[in-house]
């Protein structure tokens, strides 16, 4: 029989700094419970300013960010996707064999074909000899 762990090891726990409830209440009271609003607009503006670009986009999760990056990379390489098809439609995309689903799923969502490449034991990078 497998014994359960005494303590849970969190993959990632939230970090709170004290003002979160104030901002949640403000969003609720002003009916800005959405992907837009002054807090998001200001976050995007500050981020763009900090990294020295004209625009930045705040997304709901890292997975959404990876999907957007894959979509834009596909469009930059192959042009705008046909309606109903992904930006990587039918294209093979090299992916590490040691990964998390969020890094491969956007390739599939965009119609690409993931090709898993062995990872080098010492560096955890895709092995050049395997490409």
How does the language model describe each region?
Residues 36-92, 106-110, 116-118:
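Phosphate-binding glycine-rich loop
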Residues 59, 63, 101, 125:
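Glycine-rich phosphate-binding loop at the start of an alpha helix
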Residues 119-125:
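Conserved PLP phosphate-binding loop immediately N-terminal to the Schiff-base lysine helix
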Residues 129-131:
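Conserved small/polar residues in nucleotide/adenosyl-binding loops
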Residues 98-104:
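Conserved coil-to-alpha-helix start sites within the AMP-binding
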Residues 1-34:
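N-terminal "arm"/small-domain region of PLP-dependent enzymes with the aminotransferase-like
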């Amino acid at each position: 029989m497998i014994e359960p762990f005494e303590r849970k090891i969190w993959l990632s726990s939230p970090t709170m700094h004290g003002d979160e409830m104030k901002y949640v209440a403000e969003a609720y009271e002003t009916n800005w419970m959405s992907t837009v609003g002054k807090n998001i607009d200001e976050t995007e503006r500050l981020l763009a300013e900090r990294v020295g670009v004209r625009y930045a986009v705040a997304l709901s999760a890292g997975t959404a960010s990876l999907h957007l990056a894959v979509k834009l990379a596909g469009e930059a390489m192959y042009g705008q996707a046909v309606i109903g098809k992904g930006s990587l439609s039918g294209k093979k995309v090299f992916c590490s064999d040691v990964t998390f689903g969020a890094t491969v799923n956007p390739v599939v969502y965009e119609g690409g074909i993931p090709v898993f490449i062995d990872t080098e034991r010492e560096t955890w990078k895709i092995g050049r000899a395997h490409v």
